[in-house]
Each structure stands twice: as structure tokens, then as C-alpha cells.
Amino acid sequence: MAEHFKQIIRCPVCLKDLEEAVQLKCGYACCLQCLNSLQKEPDGEGLLCRFCSVVSQKDDIKPKYKLRALVSIIKELEPKLKSVLTMNPRMRKFQVDMTFDVDTANNYLIISEDLRSFRSGDLSQNRKEQAERFDTALCVLGTPRFTSGRHYWEVDVGTSQVWDVGVCKESVNRQGKIVLSSEHGFLTVGCREGKVFAASTVPMTPLWVSPQLHRVGIFLDVGMRSIAFYNVSDGCHIYTFIEIPVCEPWRPFFAHKRGSQDDQSILSICSVINPSAASAPVSSEGK
């Protein structure tokens, strides 16, 4: 997202900041110094747009004052933008020792013995039928549950083409088809077809995320009523839900579906990196 702001204020010709932005007849903007680099029309003094070839005469070229002002604002805010839109390493001191709650796992999810990895399978695991279990959707919850404090965990989605991670309310529906949306108690980011990313807002929010996203960092701050998602590989911010309700416990949420019959991709909870993090004084309730 920080890179997106930089692209907005760059001249497409010299790639420098558009501090003296001008606009052609068609709306194309570049810096004043780069006007001379534009091709002239064959039989006149008009300038050809690099993208659409619309001719702009001298009177058509106008200063773009709003863009100039935006450049100034973004440059002034850039240090703050970097701190807000990048992952803070100090989040890891709130990393929690998390496992999957088998009692909630769909029967077609094959969960590892250490309760930290799972994949989708063809055969039912014949676990006990109970109300806590997702009986249709390929989902599982994590433990512990959270009612207060700050908590951080990382999920390795590997080569999975279809997945969703985040949190959900303790009371979410687990029977039959579920709707992953904030209205129904799910605060998640997810992927479809390995390249389409979205947050579970209403309506859905498309996300600009690297297709190479393999590890997602999740930071839940119950006191601040927010949950933020990061690309751990480059530290880039993915999305933040704000003003989240705090009327009941939040549960870590995981969903996974095979992209094809041969897909053996695995979704995993990453191990605690800081050895002292598991015993850090975070406020949560165990299962």
C-alpha cells in the first residue's frame, strides 16, 4: 500500500515526484520538465499523449494544483505512512503458542499430531459429532480464545490456492453453509485461485497483495478493537479491521480448500519465534 502511494505521486516519464505536475487535455499528468520529452504532432506544435495519442495544444496544458498538493502531503506523511503500513517487529513479543482445536475441525480436515498443521482430505476422519464442529465448511478454530489484551500469530499458507485466516466470534454458526463476512462474525482475509485476495467486509474489500504471499502475520488488539494482517515476508500491511465488537470471545479461524484433486497443500500455524513469547504476560483465556 505504501508503494501504491508512491506510484500516485511519481511522474511516469522521469519517475521523480510530481512537485510541478501538469495535465494534458486527456488527463495524462507529468512534471513540467518532462513536457519537452513528449512527441509533437506531425503538422503542428501540439503534444501527443504517450498513452492515448490525444493531441494537446498549449492552451490545453494546465497546472494540476490538487496533485501538487497531494504530493506535498504524502511526502510530509511518508515517515508516518511507513510506520503505519509496515509490520512492527515488536508485535512478536505478543506471539501466542497456538494450536488447532480438533473439537471444532471439519471431519475432512487432516490435522497433524502436534495440532499445528492441516490439509483437506477425501476421507472423513470420523470424529465425534458435536455442535462445536464445522459439519460442512472446511474450517477449524484455534485455541486459546481471546477476551482482552494483545495477541500475535503467524500462519503459513504455503502453496494453498484457497484459504481464509483471521478470527471469528465464539458464537458463529458452524452448521451447514457459512457466510464469511463481518456481519456474521468473521474477520478474515482470504485467497481464491491463488491470486484473488479479499477481506471479509460487507461488501467484500479487494486487496492488493503479492501473489507470492505465503506467511500471514495477524495482530489482534482487543483493547484497541482492531485486528491487522501483514505479509510477513516483506512486512507490508494487508488490511485492518477497526471498531470490532468485544461482547464475546474471539477465536482464531482457519479455512482451507484444495484447488484440485491432486492438491496436497498444507496450512500451518508457525512456531513461536521468541522463546519467551509463549510465557509473555498476555491476557487471554485458555480453552
UniProtKB/Swiss-Prot annotation:
GO terms for molecular function: ubiquitin protein ligase activity; zinc ion binding. PROSITE patterns: B302_SPRY (PS50188), ZF_RING_2 (PS50089). Its main location: cytoplasm. The keyword Isomerase does not apply. One of its GO terms (cellular component) is nucleus. Residues 78-276 form the B30.2/SPRY domain. GO terms for biological process: innate immune response; regulation of gene expression. It is found in: Cytoplasm; Nucleus. A zinc finger (RING-type) spans 11-53. This is Ret finger protein-like 4A. It comes from Homo sapiens (Human). The lineage of its organism: Eukaryota, Metazoa, Chordata, Craniata, Vertebrata.
